[in-house]
Curated annotation (Swiss-Prot):
Disulfide bonds: none annotated. Its EC number is 7.1.1.2. The gene is ND4. GO terms for cellular component: mitochondrial membrane. It is a multi-pass membrane protein. GO terms for molecular function: NADH dehydrogenase (ubiquinone) activity; ubiquinone binding. This is NADH-ubiquinone oxidoreductase chain 4. It comes from Anopheles quadrimaculatus. Keywords: Electron transport, Membrane, Mitochondrion, NAD, Respiratory chain, Translocase, Transmembrane, Transmembrane helix, Transport, Ubiquinone.
Length: 448
């Protein structure tokens, strides 16, 4: 693991060479490949040092980080073609990747918090530096202040634990459980609820997605939302007693919110906004599963987090490919694309069906496990879950049918073929999504 961290460190100077764009991208994929070979199915921590280590939860998310960051460079070819500060762009992506890897491999709660917050900086720069509309400033402010305000109580909670326990090591804290600490429970959990994002504190997400460039959207949907889930997975060993008492609040809000957000999806005309709201709906069900604190819930939420990272990121790539051709993200213009880009319709279909958890995607495995855990927690949730599953399929079909079928927009006079780069990009999103269900132990068996 240390060799990978050093490799990443030595990639920083490369980002300032003249023609290093594709070399850095190849090196990121090489990193992912080396990391895959290093898979050791250990359910205890594989230490690098006192502060850093890996277990199976971190492993999948770090691999996803490498993968998505490589694909981000592949998707942002326009930055390379128009020489739009491409060296700074590469530097930002590498900095973000470095922060994410350190976040997922932190063994100390404070180090985790530090890198968790630091990953916000390059994301903000991506949105402000390479976004499209002037409103990106407002989106950046939303992103920053939602996350920072929610994270302050977390910092205070961490210092309280340090004062109380004299240690912040995750492994030592595993042996302890806080009882009747309602304020501590709230302060430790709230930052992650905002990052997930939970319904009611989700307003920063659609804004950030709509204003971000394609790379910003990919990393936001792919990895940064998963930081919230990862933090909750790590924290809940401490908070089981309070969790049993109060989790039903968040589960209720998430499930009802998921249904409402699914209805909002059906009213969207902006491609990116629709995919962003669908992320909130998916994260609602992930959060509910996590908060049941059952075996199925934890493993299912992990599987759906990995699946959603690949699927959402792929959909944002598709929306961007259409945007580059049409010059608009509106569904009123992006219609009848089956006539315009026939080759891409297959990818639209595959990723939309992945988004509604059709077999054989990993989403299916995650969603079935989550349904299992949430229904076993309470029978009443079946009503909400039925609506959620139905509307999830409805907005995925709406996105596909509206964008691909129907009459083509009359302002378009030519056909457009995709490039090999775009097909490879979509293939590298879709293939792991469907292949991972064959190796589902990777997602389901990390918890003994």
């Amino acid at each position: 693991m240390l060799k990978l961290i050093f490799m990443m460190l030595f990639m920083f100077p490369l980002s300032f060479l003249k023609n290093s764009y594709w070399m850095v991208q190849n090196l990121i994929f090489l990193l992912a490949f080396i990391f895959m070979i290093n898979l050791s199915s250990m359910n205890y921590f594989n230490y690098i040092s006192y502060y850093f280590g890996l277990d199976m939860i971190s492993y999948g998310l770090i691999l996803l980080s490498f993968w998505i960051c490589g694909l981000m460079l592949m998707a942002s070819e326009k930055v390379f073609t128009y020489n739009n500060y491409k060296n700074l762009f590469i530097f930002m992506i590498l900095f973000l990747l470095f922060m994410l890897v350190l976040t997922f491999s932190s063994m100390s709660v404070f180090m985790f918090y530090l890198f968790f917050e630091a990953s916000l900086i390059p994301t903000l720069f991506l949105i402000l530096g390479w976004g499209y509309q002037p409103e990106r400033l407002q989106a950046g402010v939303y992103l920053l202040f939602y996350t920072l305000l929610a994270s302050l109580p977390l910092l205070i909670g961490i210092f309280y634990i340090l004062n109380f326990m004299d240690t912040l090591s995750f492994t030592l804290l595993l042996n302890y459980m806080f009882t009747d600490m309602n304020l501590l429970y709230l302060s430790l959990i709230f930052a992650f609820l905002v990052k997930m994002p939970m319904f009611l504190v989700h307003l920063w997400l659609p804004k950030a997605h709509v204003e971000a460039p394609v790379s910003g959207s990919m990393i936001l949907a792919g990895i940064l939302l998963k930081l919230g889930g990862y933090g909750l997975l790590r924290m809940f060993s401490l908070l089981q007693v309070s969790g049993i008492k109060y989790n039903y609040w968040w589960i209720s809000v998430s499930l009802i919110g998921g249904v409402l957000i699914s209805l909002v999806c059906l009213r969207q005309t902006d491609l990116k906004a629709l995919i962003a709201y669908s992320s909130v709906a998916h994260m609602g069900i992930v959060l509910s599963g996590l908060l049941t604190m059952t075996y199925w819930g934890l493993t299912g939420s992990y599987a759906l987090m990995i699946a959603h990272g690949l699927c959402s990121s792929g959909l944002f790539c598709l929306a961007n490919i259409s945007y580059e051709r049409m010059g608009s993200r509106s569904l009123l213009i992006n219609k009848g694309l089956l006539n315009f880009m026939p080759t891409l319709s297959l990818w639209w279909f595959l990723l939309c069906s992945g988004n509604m958890a059709a077999p054989p995607t990993l989403n299916l495995l995650g969603e079935i496990s989550l349904l299992n855990s949430i229904v076993s927690w309470s029978w009443v949730t079946m009503i909400m879950l039925a609506f959620l599953s139905f509307f999830s399929a409805a907005y995925s079909l709406y996105l596909f049918a509206y964008s691909q079928h129907g009459k083509i927009f009359s302002g378009v006079y030519f056909f457009s073929v995709g490039t090999t780069r775009e097909f490879l990009l979509l293939m590298l999103h879709w293939l792991p999504l469907n292949m991972l269900i064959l190796k589902s132990g990777f997602c389901m068996l990390w918890l003994y």
